[in-house]
Amino acid sequence: MAAAGCLYRRTSRELWTILLGRSSMKDGHQIKAELDRYGDRLLQGLAYYRPPSTSSTGKVKANKNLSPALQELGLRLSKFLGLDEEQSVELLQTYLLYDYRGTQESVKGVPQDERQSQALMLKASMVDYYYEERISLLRCVLYILNYFQDDKHPYSAEFSKCVEMMEQKELFGKYLKQFESLCREEAPTWETHGNFMTERQVSRWFVQRLREQAMLLEIIFLYFACFAASPSDLLALTKLFKEQGFGCRLQNRHLVEPSMDPLVERIGYFSVLIFLEALDIETLMTCSLSDKTEQHPFSSEEQVCKEMDSVLVTLGDAPHHGPVLLAWALLRFALNADKVTPTVRKMGSTAIQLHIFQYLTRMLQSLRSGENNCTTSTACLCVYTFLTFVLTNLEEQVLQSQQDLVDTAFQVFAAPNLPDLFWNMEPTAGLGILLDSVVGMFPFHLSPLLKLFTALVSKSSAKKVYSFLDRMSSYTEHYRHKPHDILSHEDETLWKRQTPKVLYALGLGQTNLRIPQGTIGQVMADEHGFLVRWEYSYSCWTLFTCEIEMLLHVVSTADVIHQCQRVKPIIDLVHKVISTDLSIADCLLPITSRIYMLLQRLTTVMNPPMDFLSSCVDCLAALATRMPAKVWIDLRHTGFLPFAANPVSGHIISTEGMNAGGYGSLFGIEQSQGEYSITLSFLRLVTTLVKGQLGSTQSQGLVPCILFVLREMLPNYHRWRYNSHGVREQLGFQILSLIHAILNLSPEEEESTSTPNLQSLCIFSLTNTEAGQAVINIMGVGVDTLNAVMLTQAGSSGTEGQGQMLMQTIKLAFSITNNVIRLKPLSSAISPLEHALTQHGAHGNNLIAVLAKYIYHKYDPSLPRLAIQLLKRLAMVAPMSVYACLGSDAAAIRDAFLSRLRDNIEDMQIKIMILEFLTVAVETQPGLIELFLNLEVKDTNEGSKEYSLGEWSCLQVVLKLIDSQDPESSWGAPLLHRSAIAFLHALWQDRRDSAMTVLRTKPNFWENLTSPLFGTLAFPSESSELSILETCAFIMKIICLEIYYAVRGSLGDSLKKILKKFSEEERFTYWSNYVHSLVCQVAESEGACNSLTEYQQLLSAWRMFLMVATHNADVMHLTNPEVRQKLFKDVLGGTQALLLVPRSMTCLHLGSMLCTVMIILLRRWKSDLAAPEDILSSLTQILEGVLQKDQQLVEKTKARVFAALISALEIKPMKASEIPQYPQLVLNVCETLQEEVVFLVDHTRQEVPANDASEDKDSMETEDTGRIRQKDQRDGVCVLGLHLAKGLCEADEEGDQWQQVLRKLPVLPMLFSALEVSLRIKQNLHFCEAILHFLFTLAKTHQGAAAMAGAGVTQTVCLPLLSVYQLSSNGASTAQPALSLRKSLDAPSWPGVYRLTVSLMERLLKTLRYNFLTEALDFVGVHQERILQCLGAVRTVPSLACLEEADHTVGFLLQLSNFTKEWHFHLPQLIKDVQVNLCYLCQACTSLLHSRKMLQHYLQIKNGETMSSTATPRGQRTPQTPSKQPTAESEALELRQLRSVQHSLLKILGKTLATLRAFTPDLCQILQPLDLAQYNLLFALSFTTPAFDADVTPSFGTLLATVNVTLSMLGEMDKKKDHPLGQVLGETNSTVDNKNIKSLLLFIMENCFYLLISQAVRYLRDPSVHPRDKQRMKQELSSELSTLLSSLSRYFRRGGPSSPAGGLMPSPQPKGASAAKVVPEAQEPLIQLVQAFVRHVQR
């Protein structure tokens, strides 16, 4: 806007908001500064707004900062409003800035657009704004006058100085002139104010003037209440009041409409009050009592008094005149009774005839109906003083009706402090005279005394009222005729009873009163008989009880109405006493206990007394605040409340069997009459019972009542008939208050009953029935309607009245909807409430848009705050676009949001809520957040996009809030600062790259963001603001996310400097100490802190910060070992402190969080940590503390402690003696395992379906991970506990400690039982693998292996292991997932379980040998098919999984081959099959190793590549055109796969040949006589190299080919380091060492030669072989071996190593393998052996 920068003056509405404390300016110094700055405006009042002038017009036209269109519009507005031109332009600018409903961009076009300019005035928006400014100015003055003497008000001192200034500068005179000006102002016309001044505008102008007149008079009244008025001031006022007829003869009275009558009456009332206050009656009474009337100001102003007489003598024709005439007449009489003129006497008599007390009653009722503020209290005090003056100076008989006087007193004493003032006065003066009068007529006239005492009850006087009525000394009754049992005095002034008299005709035994014999009574005769006042002492409370009993007796008679009228004041008094002082409730039990019977009896009469019943219900509601359970129980027996005929079922929606009770019949009568006093009382009663937190059983009884409200009242109350204005709004407020109370009940403990509780009932009804739509309709009232109601309410304060009631109702609807959405159970279906909330309407006509537009509401900041809070909730849970719902108003609403966010005086809570809403929108509302981010995009020369912040971007505001150098930043408001940082965190968390890019480029962004991390925080206390902890937590998370997202090199220099500074200034140490101190504080308080949320946020962020720091130590400069040790020590200490606290879920949760980061630090910083002994000692204590807690609550924590112990054991190898408390630690782990395994087995048996076994798949090749159950997790307690047990077992090298534990606890039987169950049903995969790993470690020692064998390990796993795999028809599955897509070979799988079991059998057999042989043979017998299938599958399925299983299988067979005789005896056929399959396996491995291309072909097929169908082992590949060329990464992956497979094949081949040696004759024995029948011929007598794709019988050619392959591989490794195999096998990062590979190749070669020689000798010595074949064999062997010897000799001459298993090979000339490299090649044992054999066959 053109001149927006010129706006420096605060608007009157803003000033009023500041004074009310609804802004961010809450400090007294700020208020003083505002009052000093704008005090002159307050002093001027409405005169601040000047009329148009020529000079002002010239200044506007000369202002170059104003556009011509804005000047023109300002001048037109000046004429229309009759306002100074400069002020009109300023008013227009502020309106466009603060109240205009369009976008700020469109503001510039408003002055140029004729239609929009006219709309500003024709639609009265501009006029309303101007009128509101004028009213706000007067409200500021009123507010200051109301509270400048209130010591409890926070700004009373500042207000007092302002009032002092205004009093010195003659506030009264200025405001009196303004009032005169308003009274005499002519109505505007179209000639004077332009064509826009229509009749409607004139009417609105007149209403505004009436309101201003009333407010000016109210200000003058309050001013006179504080400062004395001079007689001349009063004379001037009186003349002015007479001129305008106390509001009845206004200048423009022809414009008065019926709707304006309350304002006209208000003007008259304040005129009267000003007159009474200006007389200073209190001073007059004080002077009269001391006979110093000459000290009164009017005593010396005789001329003024005469003029006043002449002015007032003509009055008397209007009700307003009564108090004025009587007060003046009494003043004249009090000042000089002897000189009272007839004129004055006439004034007094005229005043009495005007029914002044009825007038005063109406006046106080009218003032209190709209609002009940300080003005009303001051008016009551003024009238109280007047009544006291009147009663002191006039005889009561002169006053008309005693009842009118009591009614006035009833209204007077409604003001606070006045009852106390009355009780502190003399009982014979003032209103004490009235009290004595009504006491004298009691109980003949029952109502006056009760009404007066009802008004006199206050917190400090309730007991006085009770005591006064408890000791009544007289009893007045009326007789038409003189009774016979009376003795009378001669003059009939005294009577004496001759017989006692029972006062109430009640039955025997009932409460009653009895006047005893001889009682004296004073007689006052009247025209109707005798009025006797007996001198009889009694308790009025007993009399009240008798009156209620009488009512119960006459319920069914015609006297019931009359008796109800007598009893109703009693009930009202009891209600007031109980609600004021609950301690008296017990004393009133005889009365309150009879109210239940009254309700029961009176609800059934023909015409129930509705007001009386309403009072009864109100009384019970007050009583229920003290004893809700008793009231509920007693009330339930009456049948008054709705009830369920049958027990409440679990069907919430059903109302079957519900009865409306006695209230239901009354409710129908009220609907027909249009009066709802009982319904309001019923709602108050039920609300009180709900808030009373009844027990769950009693709360169930309230379900019918709540159902009645939700089904009958809430959906329909707005359609009922109403006789009185405002009752509908009051009903809606009460209904919503009840629902709000229910939704805010503290959660009850879960019970087994299926009946619904009150909360679930409300939630279900609101989400699924018409009740929810009714709440939506209330929220849909809209800001325009609400603002209109607020403008039209008659009250002056703006903080009370009908508009406030509507506003509170809408706020309740917001809160209820928010709570319903928050508390409703999760469901996939959309409820009717959610559908109605989120449905789109045309032209923005939907609830979302209505909610968003509440941002335009300016009166109460809590209303838009609650609306935004509901928007936030809907944005979180509702599947809709807020942006789409806003439609074309979206940009304007955004500008309104940001305007309030930018405003430096805006309420802080609104700003916080706006930021929280935007924080949620980042994740859930992409369109809306883009609107608020308002990023402008520019295309750069490089073709990329460059972002910048738009003028109306929320980031502009957020950057300003976090700027520590900006005076308007949020650093003085921690909660606002936290919200701003939380919004930035949401941007990073949702990875809004465009916004992040812009923010990174902003200067000092990272410095401003991270400033809190470099400050020194005070240690938190109960009273400190802890949002700074959350702020720091969000900052840490933003840094972590930035490092995570950005490549290390792309981090901004600014952030790099910050991180370096963070390290250099030792902030790691500082924050570690701070977090550690917080943790210790929580531990010391056992989790009973009030700030756990903030602590948890900071702890979570610190945990993330450390995790990122461990992975990016160089970026975050966390490389100092001492700092690392310090951080880990604090984490470990904090974890220990928290987890050792017993019975605290909070400490357990926080400790579990710390335990996670401790595990990571243990794994990442192993080399920098201190000795593991100290760490293990602390972890052992932590484990003991955790094990003492409820085990169902600490399952995850136990798992994390186990993981930490595992990591600590991995720091360095340790023996059992070096581990602190090793025996106890082992015992704790085993005991925990025992409990967890039992639970796991039970859980498995319950959860697993019966048909699980049928779903098992062929597991030879598939990585079937099974269905991981909830309790069987990789990081579960059982699995980690077993891994920890494995680590502890490895430390016990001798096995002694574990032997003791195994003897003490049944660990092994329990584990075996669980393993058997899991294997049998093929569940708990991770658990099975962990058990087998533990057992494998335990089997390393002889004691452990023996214990396992003794516990029956074979019986446990042998047969159940069959369930793990299932053979296919062809023995192997051909479907295999791609190798590159498969998990690591070490990942849990059922084939892996089988492999581990085979390895375990191998280990046990190796350790126990003959002691385990029988079990081993049993295992082989059971699984022989699988074993044979595995050996044969290598040729067809050369995958890592298959090769790994073959490796384990051959290893087991290698151990078993040491017992060939026993094996042959038990399983003769199997040993033959194994021999055959081993030979074929040898041939398959050799073929695959020989043809690398064929092996690559297999791997590529498994990786999904298309191969040529004509490929041969030696042919060239002719692949189809691939979709993309192979990359360096894919080639490297293929090379690694090839390396792994080749290494596996070599290991299998070595073990296979070693196993076959057991089935061939020993070379040392075969030369001697030997039974050849026990050794089968393993290889065929053929020397042809077998083809891979042919099913060729293994032969000598196979062994020779194997030797050739090994020689070839050895040669390649030595010659070509750049060869693929050499590169792969020679990689420094490879797990396979080059030297070990060579040794393995030599081992294979040795075994080949051994088998070759042994089998050849076996052929030579076999008589069944033809000599010709033997001769051919010799020739072939001689030739082949000679060739191989020459190649072998060349290899050894180059320095090749000898086989590490050379000692295993028997040689004719035994040589040590250790000298292989230093002796000539001829001395190699291998070469010597082969040479000897060649010489032998050549002979």
From Swiss-Prot:
* Top-rank taxon: Eukaryota
Question: What Gene Ontology terms for biological process does this UniProt record contain?
Answer: mRNA transport; protein transport
List where in the cell it is found.
Nucleus, Nuclear pore complex
Name the Pfam families on file. Nup188_N, Nup188_N-subdom_III, Nup188_SH3-like
- Where does it mainly reside? nucleus
Looking up InterPro entries in the UniProt record yields: ARM-type_fold, Nucleoporin_Nup188_N, Nup188, Nup188_N-subdom_III
Task: State what the entry records as the consequence of deleting this gene.
Answer: Morpholino knockdown of the protein causes abnormal heart and gut looping.
Q: Where is the composition biased (Polar residues)?
A: 1506-1528
GO CC, alphabetical: nuclear pore
Q: Which UniProt keywords apply?
A: mRNA transport, Nuclear pore complex, Nucleus, Protein transport, Translocation, Transport
Q: Does the keyword Disulfide bond apply?
A: no
Q: Does the keyword Protease apply?
A: no
- Molecular function terms, GO-annotated: structural constituent of nuclear pore
Cite the record's Basic and acidic residues compositional bias ranges: 1254-1269
Annotated region (Disordered) at 1249-1269, 1506-1530, 1696-1717
Q: How does it assemble?
A: Part of the nuclear pore complex (NPC).
What family does the database annotate? Belongs to the Nup188 family.
* Function recorded in the entry: Component of the nuclear pore complex (NPC), a complex required for the trafficking across the nuclear envelope. Required for proper protein transport into the nucleus.
Q: What is this protein called?
A: Nucleoporin NUP188
Q: Which species is this record about?
A: Xenopus tropicalis (Western clawed frog)
The primary gene name is nup188
